[in-house]
């Protein structure tokens, strides 16, 4: 059997992946905070872990993939205050947008998608456990984790006690015993979401939500914990502290995998620079399959530089692959992808190396080798491309079905929210692309003009 090796953030080494139970791999990835459109950085993380899960499913008999929805957060509260909408309206709409965008990038949904609001009881129970073990304390309606009680705190992210102290000195709350103590529970005023608890009406802190959802869905120790590199500190450092102190002897997560950052045209993506790109923006420029392919062309731990030129080049590469498949009348995929392709992916999810194998297979297929064409399709399908026939791709239908369905769903949501200007704009956008909508009692259908 091919051996997967992964760079483990915890040990700072690339290691052979050995799940606790080879018959059942358990994986958790931090999901979105649902208050706005998903941006390209969000998408990169989802595509990376979707690809890793595809590889794991190819090599192991059972994989349980959990990715949460953070639907309790001060950013959500602020957006509700800004727009006048209810928190429920905001989280429902933006969760729907997230699902539509990820589907347009051919990311399969996780096996379990817990929401923080669905696990308040688990969160309270975990906090009570930490208090009972002397690792947390109540103060002025808050509950805080006492970092001084965890000798391992800071080691995961490589921060010294001095660095941790320096980082915690900004706006230190008077109720904290130590400046670095972090919130597990905080009081909620009447106008914000809150739940009854032993410490009064309040809501959980962000970090405890993930620890509780992992324990509720996967148990004390999981095989892989993933997320973006920006979560290493404080989020993942704090998750480890909470979970390992609540369950002594537990590893919590055996392997930590982090996706690198994404920049646009060589600069950090930010609204102030005017280069902030949502998934929706980019799907208006290229098929979702091309966006996915671009996100896989850079190794997951490296910085990915997005540009319009890079997206166009990704589309051209896919054109070439589809030409190779077209030459063989869209062959059925081989029973298994070529070993060299799997070996590249198994080497710390080396997608650039795997894509080089796709090019070699396409070269051979263009020279008439039918087996290479079948291997090309099988390999591409494993990483989430070749979702269409060559004819569909070149007629533009690939842009297309997933994107059209996502826009129709967005239009429906806009109409429900009485945002008729947006609904009309979507209809006009689709009409300009030759897509005609027909609204009927059973919903909206579409056809090409």
From Swiss-Prot:
Protein name: Cysteine--tRNA ligase
Catalysed reaction equations from the record: tRNA(Cys) + L-cysteine + ATP = L-cysteinyl-tRNA(Cys) + AMP + diphosphate
Binding site for Zn(2+): 30, 210, 235, 239
Cofactor(s) in the UniProt record: Zn(2+)
Short motif ('HIGH' region): ranges: 32-42
Coiled coil: none
Family statement drawn from the similarity comment of this UniProt entry: Belongs to the class-I aminoacyl-tRNA synthetase family.
Cofactor-binding details, from the entry: Binds 1 zinc ion per subunit.
Pfam family, one: tRNA-synt_1e
Subcellular locations according to the entry: Cytoplasm
Assembly and oligomerization: Monomer.
Motif 'KMSKS' region mapped to chain: 268-272
InterPro entries to which the protein is assigned, alphabetical: Cys-tRNA-ligase, Cys-tRNA-synt_Ia_DALR, Cys-tRNA/MSH_ligase, CysS_C, Rossmann-like_a/b/a_fold, tRNA-synt_1_cat_dom, tRNAsynth_Ia_anticodon-bd
UniProt GO BP: cysteinyl-tRNA aminoacylation
Alphabetized PANTHER family for the sequence: CYSTEINE--TRNA LIGASE, CYTOPLASMIC (PTHR10890:SF3), CYSTEINYL-TRNA SYNTHETASE (PTHR10890)
The keyword tRNA-binding belongs to this UniProt entry's keyword annotation: no
Binding-site list for ATP: 271
EC number per UniProt: 6.1.1.16
Signal peptide: none
SUPFAM superfamilies assigned to the protein according to its UniProt record, in alphabetical order: Anticodon-binding domain of a subclass of class I aminoacyl-tRNA synthetases, Nucleotidylyl transferase
Keywords: Aminoacyl-tRNA synthetase, ATP-binding, Cytoplasm, Ligase, Metal-binding, Nucleotide-binding, Protein biosynthesis, Zinc
GO MF terms, alphabetically ordered: ATP binding; cysteine-tRNA ligase activity; zinc ion binding
GO CC annotations on file: cytosol
Top-rank EC class of the record's enzyme: ligase
């Amino acid at each position: 059997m091919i051996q997967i090796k992964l760079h483990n953030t915890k040990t700072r080494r690339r290691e052979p992946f050995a799940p606790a139970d080879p018959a059942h791999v358990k994986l958790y990835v931090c999901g979105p905070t649902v208050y706005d459109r998903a941006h390209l950085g969000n998408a990169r993380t989802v595509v990376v872990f979707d690809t890793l899960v595809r590889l794991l499913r190819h090599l192991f008999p059972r994989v349980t993939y959990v990715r949460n929805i953070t639907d309790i957060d001060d950013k959500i509260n602020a957006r509700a205050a800004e727009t006048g909408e209810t928190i429920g309206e905001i989280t429902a709409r933006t969760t729907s947008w997230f699902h539509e965008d990820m589907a347009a990038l051919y990311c399969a949904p996780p096996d379990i998608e817990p929401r923080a609001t669905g696990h308040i009881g688990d969160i309270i129970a975990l906090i009570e456990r930490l208090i009972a073990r002397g690792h947390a304390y109540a103060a002025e309606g808050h509950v805080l984790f006492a970092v001084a009680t965890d000798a391992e705190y800071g080691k995961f992210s490589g921060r010294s006690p001095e660095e941790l102290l320096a980082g915690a000195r900004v706006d230190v709350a008077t109720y904290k015993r130590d400046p670095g103590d972090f919130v597990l529970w905080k009081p909620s005023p009447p106008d914000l979401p809150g739940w009854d608890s032993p410490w009064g009406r309040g809501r959980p802190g962000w970090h405890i939500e993930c620890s509780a959802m992992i324990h509720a869905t996967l148990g004390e120790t999981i095989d892989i914990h993933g997320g973006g590199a920006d979560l290493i500190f404080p989020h993942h450092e704090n998750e480890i502290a909470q979970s390992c102190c609540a369950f002594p002897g537990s590893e919590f997560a055996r392997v930590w995998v982090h996706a690198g950052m994404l920049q646009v045209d060589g600069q950090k993506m930010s609204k102030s620079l005017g280069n902030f790109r949502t998934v929706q923006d980019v799907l208006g420029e290229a098929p979702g399959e091309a966006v996915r392919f671009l996100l896989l062309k850079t190794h997951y731990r490296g910085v990915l530089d997005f540009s319009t030129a890079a997206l166009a080049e990704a589309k051209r590469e896919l054109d070439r692959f589809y030409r190779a498949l077209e030459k063989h009348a869209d062959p059925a995929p081989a029973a298994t992808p070529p070993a060299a392709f799997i070996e590249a992916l198994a080497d710390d999810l080396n997608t650039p190396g795997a894509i080089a194998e796709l090019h070699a297979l396409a070269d051979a297929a263009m020279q008439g080798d039918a087996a290479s064409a079948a291997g090309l399709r099988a390999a591409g399908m494993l990483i989430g491309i070749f979702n269409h026939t060559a004819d569909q791709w070149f007629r533009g239908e690939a842009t297309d079905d997933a994107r059209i369905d996502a826009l129709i769903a967005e239009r429906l949501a806009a109409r429900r929210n009485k945002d008729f200007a947006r609904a009309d704009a979507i209809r006009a956008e689709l009409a300009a692309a030759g897509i005609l909508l027909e609204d009927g009692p059973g919903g909206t259908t579409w056809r090409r003009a």
